[in-house]
Amino acid sequence: GSAILGLILGLMLLAYPGYLAYRASRLPAISDITTDPSNPPRFDVLARLRPRGSSDYPGAAVARQQTAAYPDVAPLQLNVPIKVAYDTTLALVNKRKWHVVDARPPAAGRRDAVIEAVARTPIMGFRDDVVIRVTATREGARVDMRSASRYAWHDFGTNASRIRSLLEDLDDSVGATPVPRPEQKSQPPRGQPAK
């Protein structure tokens, strides 16, 4: 009886490292993922918390590996005003209990709204840094995201999964939210001058 229990416990202890080894063999050894490799969202406040030299996006070679491994990690275009996109994104970040270190809402004279936050990996609790950029477009708003492990050289797909999950939830949430319409000026009754 105790030998079988010991064997089961041993297998359970080896299961997670085995799973990571399997993931490592199938995924590229990268740990900085973004929806926009040509112009990735930048760490600003988080740059002070990251190891020296790790805040800049790693470049074209990593972008090629990312595109091959995670072709679905792409910007999200929403047909809602930037304020709705930003507020919904911030609500989802808070719901996930990520630690928000900076939140810059849309404002006159500011091109992008930005959220910077620290997320933790589910099992080991490692810190990963996240920056989300919301930009006004003619159609509504575009959301770009970057998720980077603070210390790891291989993220085992965690950052891509985090981006996918947030953007899918954002798309679903915005689709279920009524879009505020601009106020319309009331038309005067026929035969009366406009005020």
What is each stretch, according to the model?
Residues 1-6, 10, 16-195:
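Ser/Thr-rich, low-complexity intrinsically disordered terminal regions
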